């Protein structure tokens, strides 16, 4: 139930005119802004910091200046809210405890009514478009490794002064294996045997169960999968609750992207996944008989990463 979800790539536009110059063409504007922010320091950019969240307004800038503002957030989760966006923001995210960047995943979810700016992943001047202006699809989550870069938020040209707010929530999640990032970035791609075995040991939830119903929500570009669980291996949050009948089963709901095309099916599956922004997101989900085969093969070779019951 996991498939490659292609990320949109692109460069920011050039909303602010610059005088022509002879010789080689100047660098792209977003890269130029980043360089200026580093060179000018306090002279050409503002610096803001807060433990978890930041809220600011472009109205504090002089009308003729398109500033790049540095925002430093040192927390596991929070939000950024930028009213009347002008210029650009460089959002620096770090955990509030020591942890190597290569072990951290950043996930962002834009506000439903977010507009006025594009959100990019930036590293050494290269930009990858994460959330285009106005794409505030509810529930849409974008994730990347912290070592892949930082967030560059660039205001888009506007013809009026109507109120616009660019905003998003963020989470910093410690990942135990590289496969955890695949789960976030490619939730529809089928898992390999190794990924399944790691998922059952390291996911926020792992259960054996069947699909009772699937509710597609086009407005969220999401599908809600309603599960009946016969065996609960692990869960960090109360995703699954005992059924009212008290027959030893549990029930709960997990989510995945609409594009994965999940449908109700017969038989038991192993469902694994992680919590993001308070919701259970589906990761690896092989048929249970296939998981039994994977686990048995790994056990015979002494390669199973943890002990679980497969009866």
UniProtKB/Swiss-Prot annotation:
Domain of life of the native organism: Eukaryota
Compartment list: Secreted
UniProt keyword Signal, yes or no: yes
Region: Disordered, residue numbers: 1-24
Tissue expression summary: Highly expressed in the skeletal muscle, in subcutaneous adipose tissue, epididymal white adipose tissue depots and heart. Also expressed in brown adipose tissues and kidney.
Disulfide bond positions: 52-75, 107-143, 188-260, 191-284, 201-306
Function: Hormone induced following exercise or cold exposure that promotes energy expenditure. Induced either in the skeletal muscle after exercise or in adipose tissue following cold exposure and is present in the circulation. Able to stimulate energy expenditure associated with the browning of the white fat depots and improves glucose tolerance. Does not promote an increase in a thermogenic gene program via direct action on adipocytes, but acts by stimulating several immune cell subtypes to enter the adipose tissue and activate their prothermogenic actions.
Family to which this protein belongs: Belongs to the meteorin family.
Record's protein name: Meteorin-like protein
Native organism: Homo sapiens (Human)
């Amino acid at each position: 139930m996991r498939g490659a979800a292609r990320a949109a790539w692109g460069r920011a536009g050039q909303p602010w005119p610059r005088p022509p110059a002879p010789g080689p063409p100047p660098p792209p504007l977003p890269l130029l802004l980043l360089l200026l922010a580093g060179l000018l320091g306090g002279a050409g950019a503002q610096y803001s910091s807060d433990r978890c969240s930041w809220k600011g307004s472009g109205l504090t800038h002089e009308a003729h200046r398109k500033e790049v503002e540095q925002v430093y957030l040192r927390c596991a989760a929070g939000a950024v809210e930028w009213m009347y966006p002008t210029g650009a923001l460089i959002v620096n995210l770090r955990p509030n405890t020591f942890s190597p960047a290569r072990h951290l995943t950043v996930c962002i979810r834009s506000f439903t009514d977010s507009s006025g700016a594009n959100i990019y992943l930036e590293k050494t001047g290269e930009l990858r478009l994460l959330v285009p202006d106005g794409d505030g699809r509810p529930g849409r989550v974008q994730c990347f490794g912290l070592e892949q870069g930082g967030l560059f938020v660039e205001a888009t040209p506007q013809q009026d002064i109507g109120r616009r707010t660019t905003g998003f929530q963020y989470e910093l999640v410690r990942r135990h294996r590289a496969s955890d990032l695949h789960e976030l970035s490619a939730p529809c791609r089928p898992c390999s045997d190794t990924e399944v075995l790691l998922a059952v040991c390291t996911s926020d939830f792992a259960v054996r169960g069947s699909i009772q119903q699937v509710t597609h929500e086009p407005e969220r570009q999401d599908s809600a999968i309603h599960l009946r669980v016969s065996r609960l291996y692990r869960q960090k949050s109360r995703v699954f609750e005992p059924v009212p009948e008290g027959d030893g089963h549990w029930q709960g709901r997990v989510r995945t992207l609409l594009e994965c095309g999940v449908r109700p099916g017969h038989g038991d599956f192993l469902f694994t996944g992680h919590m993001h922004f308070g919701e259970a997101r589906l990761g690896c989900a092989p048929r249970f008989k296939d998981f039994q085969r994977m686990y048995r093969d790994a056990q015979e070779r002494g390669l199973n990463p943890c002990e679980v019951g497969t009866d």
